[in-house]
């Protein structure tokens, strides 16, 4: 019987060495499996996606186009960053008083170094590695300091438990340049004792100089500290008789906070 010519002259058969080497080359790249963990979320890049980044000629041979491949890698990392970067994003926050507020953060959180990540990812795919890249918890979790500037009251939650509370006096609302900023911050360092100074004036003296026993800065020159010169804290004091921006605490409470505050703890300030 007449066998259709197409079957007789199949250009490439399954055991064709060229096809085998193309498959092998393709498999080398698509064997990679890279899992990223962002806080409680994970995402995996594997052969299902990588196979679409490869190019083949009309005979099914893998053509290595480095520019095209690196572009795919860069695009993938950019997409990860858009999805998971938290620095500079606004978060919804549930306050202890029962409100929902939106707080943005220019410092707290994390941000992918896209160039470095793309270079590493490209390397991992080409060496068909099975890796897990973990990034720190990107949400606030259940350990944080809540600074409610409208209530003039703060809370320190550790693993969901309220371990510290205090009234305070924040930046004076009568002066635009003294108002405490809303945002998400984190402790820079702590020092005991310290002298806090305002802006230096033309005659070489400072706008103010205050000696404090407990200094915990978290936003430029703004931080938590004891204010032994105040008799009262909380309420409406901050509206007209507030600080230069700092969170003034009763001395005993400042001592307790100084003792328990951890580096890296998110400090959520809002009105």
Where does each model-flagged region fall?
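Active-site scaffold segments
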Residues: 214-260, 265-269
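Surface-exposed, secretory/extracytoplasmic low-complexity segments enriched in Ser/Thr/Asn/Gly/Pro
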Residues: 1-210, 214, 261-263, 269-271
């Amino acid at each position: 019987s007449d066998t259709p010519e197409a079957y007789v002259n199949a250009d490439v058969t399954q055991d064709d060495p060229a096809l085998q080497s193309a498959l092998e080359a393709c498999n080398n790249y698509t064997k990679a499996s890279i899992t990223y963990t962002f806080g409680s979320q994970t995402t995996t890049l594997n052969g299902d996606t990588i196979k679409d980044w490869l190019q083949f000629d009309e005979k099914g041979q893998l053509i290595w186009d480095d520019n095209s491949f690196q572009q795919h890698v860069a695009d993938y990392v950019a997409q990860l960053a858009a999805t998971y970067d938290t620095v500079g994003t606004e978060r919804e926050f549930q306050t202890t008083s029962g409100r929902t507020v939106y707080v943005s953060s220019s410092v707290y959180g994390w941000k992918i170094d896209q160039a470095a990540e793309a270079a590493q990812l490209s390397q991992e795919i080409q060496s068909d590695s099975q890796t897990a890249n973990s990034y720190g918890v990107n949400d606030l979790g259940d350990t944080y300091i809540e600074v409610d500037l409208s209530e003039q009251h703060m809370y320190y939650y550790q693993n969901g438990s309220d371990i510290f509370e205090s009234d305070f006096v924040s930046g004076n609302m009568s002066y635009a340049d003294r108002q405490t900023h809303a945002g998400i911050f984190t402790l820079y360092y702590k020092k005991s004792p310290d002298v806090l100074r305002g802006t230096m004036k033309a005659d070489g003296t400072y706008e103010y100089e205050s000696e404090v026993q407990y200094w915990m800065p978290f936003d430029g020159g703004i931080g938590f500290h004891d204010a032994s010169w105040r008799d009262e804290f909380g309420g409406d004091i901050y509206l007209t008789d507030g600080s230069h921006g700092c969170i003034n605490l009763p001395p005993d409470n400042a001592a307790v906070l100084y003792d328990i505050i951890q580096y890296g703890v998110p400090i959520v300030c809002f009105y």
